[in-house]
């Protein structure tokens, strides 16, 4: 092989290596996190809303620059961006991200102070809105946190049955799932309610769990 041919072959190998490196970089999975927290404001559960602030502050403390978060209410009709109380994607600069977190916490605190009970509970609509948000952000890790008793109660005219819910790559965590008065008479209602939501999430390809002890959030995020 002549010196010219050897040099040309070496250049081709360098070009191939560069192309492969670029392809590898382009297909890398994002490492950031997206969190969507749903807060049930319906009926008597509205009295629990103050506890949600603890969860939100914990989430803010765990999230890093380039992570995204949104907090939205569950009420009569939850499949709408109007239900989003606050949302943010944190700046790469830590000082700016901390300013964003403080502003976010302030908006949440205002919501908690002013919230009023909703007559109905559209959990499925809230989940659909959450999935839209997380899909748009396209983060590497996706979490939906639901602060609710998980009892769906739809107003007349709201259709939510058999809606396709794609939970692939999403962790869904139900928090502070309080027991209804009827659950005390028949605990099977509580257990079957949670089992139905677990089945819906897992059938959609997601992962489901329940955390009722708000003092043990170490495994969250």
Q: Which positions does each model-derived feature cover?
A:
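Bacterial N-terminal signal peptides that target proteins for export
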Residues: 2-14
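C-terminal motif of bacterial Sec signal peptides marking the signal peptidase cleavage site
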Residues: 21-24
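Bacterial signal peptide processing site
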Residues: 26-28
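VWA/integrin I-like adhesion module and closely mimicked acidic/polar interface patches used
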Residues: 151-196
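Von Willebrand factor A/integrin I-like adhesion domains
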Residues: 186-221
């Amino acid at each position: 092989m002549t010196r010219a041919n050897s040099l040309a072959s070496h250049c081709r190998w360098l070009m191939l290596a560069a192309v492969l490196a670029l392809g590898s970089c382009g297909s890398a999975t994002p490492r950031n996190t997206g969190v969507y927290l749903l807060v049930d404001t319906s009926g008597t559960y509205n009295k629990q809303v103050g506890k949600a602030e603890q969860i939100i502050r914990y989430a803010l403390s765990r999230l890093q620059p380039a992570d995204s978060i949104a907090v939205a209410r569950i009420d009569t009709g939850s499949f709408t961006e109007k239900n989003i109380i606050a949302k943010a994607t944190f700046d790469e600069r830590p000082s700016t991200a901390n300013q964003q977190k403080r502003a976010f916490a302030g908006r949440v605190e205002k919501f908690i102070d002013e919230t009023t009970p909703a007559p109905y509970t559209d959990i499925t609509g809230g989940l659909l809105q959450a999935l839209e948000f997380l899909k748009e952000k396209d983060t590497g890790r996706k979490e939906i946190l639901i602060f609710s008793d998980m009892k769906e109660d739809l107003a007349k005219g709201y259709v939510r049955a058999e809606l396709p819910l794609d939970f692939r790559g999403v962790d869904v965590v139900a928090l502070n799932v309080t027991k209804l008065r009827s659950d005390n008479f028949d605990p099977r209602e509580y257990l079957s309610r949670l089992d139905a939501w677990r089945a819906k999430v897992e059938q959609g390809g997601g992962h489901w769990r329940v955390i009722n002890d708000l003092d043990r959030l170490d495994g969250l995020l």
